Amino acid sequence: MSKILIIDDDLDILETMGSLLENEGFEIHSADSVQKGMELIDSVSPDLILLDVMFPEKKTRGFEAAAEIKAKHPKIPIFVLTAINREYAFDFNKEDVKAEEFLNKPVKIDRLIKLIRNYI
């Protein structure tokens, strides 16, 4: 069973997305902060990470976390999720943030599942 780590400070997102992905047969692990997510990566060894961009800790913490994760775990695909406005979001691209995919919230679950299956 493929493992997905969801890192998002929105508990509703963690619960809803986690439940939907579990129903698709994925093993879900979740963290409500970047720090907790970083701690889980080594113990869980996820096959893919869904990472929110905006955290209360720091405005660009999600982008920084993606780069840090890629430095330590270059083979784990990262999907960056954001609800920030399009102008700001498009100032960044996949290469800048070290992510395989960059998705705007609300994410269409069928599209997300298709993308996940393409990577794992």
Region locations from a protein language model:
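Alpha4 helix (beta4-alpha4-beta5 surface) of REC/receiver domains from two-component response regulators
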Residues: 61-64, 68-71, 82-103, 110, ...
